[in-house]
Amino acid sequence: MAAKHVLFSTDARQKMLSGVNLLANAVKVTLGPKGRHVVLNKSYGAPTITKDGVSVAKEIELADKFENMGAQMLKQVASKANDEAGDGTTTATVLAQALINEGMKAVAAGMNPMDLKRGIDKAVSAAVEKLHQLAKPCSDTQSITQVGAISANSDHAIGEIIAQAMEKVGRNGVITVEEGQALQNELSVVEGMQFDRGYLSPYFINQPKAGCVELENPYVLLVDKKISHIRELLPILESVAKASRSLLIIAEDVDGDALATLVVNSMRGIIKVAAVKAPGFGEQRKAMLEDIAALTAGRVISEEIGLELEKVTLDDLGSAKKVTINKDNTTIVDGAAEPSALQDRIAQIQHQLEHTTSQYDRDKLQQRIAKLSGGVAVIKIGAATEVEMKEKKDRVDDALHATRAAVEEGIVAGGGVALLKIANELSNLQGDNDDQNVGIRIALRAMEEPLRQIAINAGDEASVIANQVKTGDEHYGYNAATGQFGNMLEMGILDPAKVTRSALQFAASIAGLMITTEAMVSEVDKESAA
């Protein structure tokens, strides 16, 4: 077993604090509309220029192992805030740094770390309650635009495109961000359900100019297995031909004489037919087939439940108004499902979403809900260079998460104003003893720090700005972009309540752990051991 290096009490906390400050000082310069850029060197390619706090935090590894422990713990604050609300990473880092620095001073002065932690927790709980009271619902397009713009570092074009996307696909809709080919941002909305599987043979194409297959009012056959022999399909093909309708076959795979016969029939015009592979793999494929069945009011033909392909009737098939298939995607528009049946399926997936812990599964379930709800919006980012593209994409991702958070828990005055006002209101909060009172004071002072840092980054005097803001009503604040004081909501400077709440809670959580740390253990470096 490798030898270990152990540090205790003040020595341990001092090393940890040094790591915290190194990381926080690099991250906090990005806060606010006049936040500075940080340039990140990559082992390959051009350096990345960013104003995204979590991107900066992720890049930092320190040489000293004890300092690095402090930096990595602070990094957790940024990534947790990012996971919870998708934004507020820099705010969370600034709050945590203020709490840790003041907390360490109090511990060094001989105060009880556990009581300090209790005091901080008490102040944070009271602040979260006040935050919920202050929050105003965010449902109109203008508010969503403003939240998106603020989160994207005051880029109104990004705020507007996100608001348009949310308007088109609804709250449950999936909005994806991709790198575009043009210089301008573009928004495209896919109506109906789309999945990433194209036609199995180009000979199915009936729209040569567009290079796609279009089926009007088709039946939809869903099969949970590979189809290789045409005899399995003959009975249902004859029934569909008699009904003078087209047919879409979605199966695990279609090959051999089954595919050849379908192609020949399609080319001769005997029956309009197209075959595609089912989306997904394994259990995911079965779930997706069930979703398509719910959308088209059909059944999944599976031998697991005793349904055989040769015995399928027209009643087992789903149907849709239109299906478009190109080499990469299949889009089903206006499935024949009853709205109530579709809502039941969505509720079922929603239930799974609430009980899953994996982020990957959450994303997949969210996508399935969106596809059933009838829309996926794609924002294509336009930029002149690759470096600008990466930086812009990060900002759009942040803005997208922030707007979702705003719709979920409402909005409060931005620019650090909400936390400063709450700290002011809680100035008379008392703990059970003097050490707890010190913890409460530390937390309330830390809540002023985001506004102060925004002012510093804008080149203003933080104390003057903070004192001026304290004199006004609950929405009165400072617009660092223009240098003006006024009503933050009217000026369109808004923060999602969820982002502010999660930043404060995660910062307090990590600060509490660090303040109460009494020993640190790390492996001895081989060089120093030698």
UniProtKB/Swiss-Prot annotation:
It catalyses: ATP + H2O + a folded polypeptide = ADP + phosphate + an unfolded polypeptide. It comes from the Bacteria. CDD domains: GroEL (cd03344). Keywords: ATP-binding, Chaperone, Cytoplasm, Isomerase, Nucleotide-binding. ATP binds at residues 30-33, 51, 87-91, 415, 479-481, 495. GO terms for biological process: chaperone cofactor-dependent protein refolding; protein refolding; response to heat. One of its GO terms (cellular component) is GroEL-GroES complex. Coiled coil: none annotated. Signal peptide: none annotated. Pfam families: Cpn60_TCP1. Its EC number is 5.6.1.7. Its main location: cytoplasm. Forms a cylinder of 14 subunits composed of two heptameric rings stacked back-to-back. Interacts with the co-chaperonin GroES. Belongs to the chaperonin (HSP60) family. PANTHER family: 60 KDA HEAT SHOCK PROTEIN, MITOCHONDRIAL. This is Chaperonin GroEL 2. The gene is groEL2.
